[in-house]
Amino acid sequence: MWFCIDLGADAFKEAGVLAGKKNRRVLQYILGLNIFKRELIPPCKDPDPYQIQILLKNYILKNVSTVFTYYCQ
């Protein structure tokens, strides 16, 4: 999920509704915060699974730290 957000995912409302239906209230709340930065890493223009796997292998969480900072204030 964090990888998708860092790539610029923007379906937070839809994902929040799904999280609510699955009784994932914390996730629903996090998705509703609207504090995520988009375009932190270049968008993946090549949907090739091999290229995505390379991105995931070298991936460092970015937006998850935003959530922790928000909760720890």
Swiss-Prot record:
Q: Which GO terms describe its biological process?
A: taxis
Q: Which Pfam families does the entry mention?
A: ASFV_360
Superkingdom assignment: Viruses
Question: Which family does the similarity line name?
Answer: Belongs to the asfivirus DP63R family.
Protein name according to UniProt? Uncharacterized protein DP63R
